Amino acid sequence: MRLKAALLVPAACLLLALAGCGSPSPSASASPSADSSATASESASAAPTAHPSVAPSSTIDGIKVTGDFGAEPTISFTTPFAIDQTRSKVLVAGKGPEVTATNYVDINYKGVNGYTGETFDSSWSRGTSVQLSLQGVVAGFQKGLTGKHVGDRVLIAMPGSDGYDSSGGSSDGSILIGDTLVFVVDILDIDYQSPHGTTLTP
């Protein structure tokens, strides 16, 4: 199959290493009161930019995942959780082709904030898989999937430096600077961006 760049799903923008991919803010009313404007300004300035620091773990063994490949997983761990570097583990091994850092991939995924334990995105909840380029996602996502295989279910935990720190967290405030992100990803298919297979001599 061919997974074209044009097939990128807008709802998966949290995965993309691009700033400003959140929804536009609602239009302001024609004549807002001075009091409401001041309150909004004060609330914005008071919003936290980072959670208190957490001693990072060097293992993801404490993250428990239940559910079969293809079904939305349940992810549980003790919060707040932080990881020292991007780490990944194959939970269910597939037998398909190996994923490279330049592939387009067709995946289902669920993302949970390591600090709060709250789910911030899930393709399963939208009822459709996501097609994206591993060259256009946050570093931790690329690191976690490179070298895995089609048919794998993969657990990935990434520190904020490999997540959304560079964009100041998520636009909706569900992810702050420094937050570790935990993903479970089912790799459904890939598309090659370079020649592959066995060379045949005429």
Question: Can you describe what each PLM-predicted range is?
Answer:
Residues 2-202:
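Cross-family detector of peptidyl-prolyl cis-trans isomerase
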